[in-house]
Amino acid sequence: MSSAVGASVLLLVAREAKQRNGGQFTDAHGEMLASLPPEDLRLVQAASELMARDLVVKVTAPSGRSFFRVESLNKYRRKEQDADVSVDSVTQPFDESMVSGNGANYYNCFSHYCTCAAFHDTVVTTHPLAMCKHMMARLLADATGRYQTMQVEDIHLAQMLCPPPTVEGDDRLFSPGR
């Protein structure tokens, strides 16, 4: 979103669609979204594509804590083919490949933060946008209920949010004695 006003419009539309309309967008919502600048509409379109391909996953633990994980389209484009999106990673048991929260496969998304580089570059550093396409996809998916679900144990949720160090010697940074 190119402005706080644009972000506010999208948040209002998503909240209304979720609470009042059972996840359905109305013509009035369309009119509100149509008032957004073209760059914001491109982000909405990119986020809608992520949601339409079922790349948004809500990860929930028994404690009730949850977050959204959005799969990257880049891994499919790098293969220079339009591959079918598989949700095997969502339905399979937890494994170590699911720990990484950023990079080529997944981005961990919250209402206020995303682990993608675009969030850091365009939202945090230069401020032309109020959110990235992954955060917008999370918002749209939550409003419409159109997302995959993944149940994990609390320890696995913690590992997904804060992966253990991968470089030898970095473990001292996370030792309980520090």
Predicted regions, residues:
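Long, low-complexity, compositionally biased intrinsically disordered regions
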Residues: 1-178
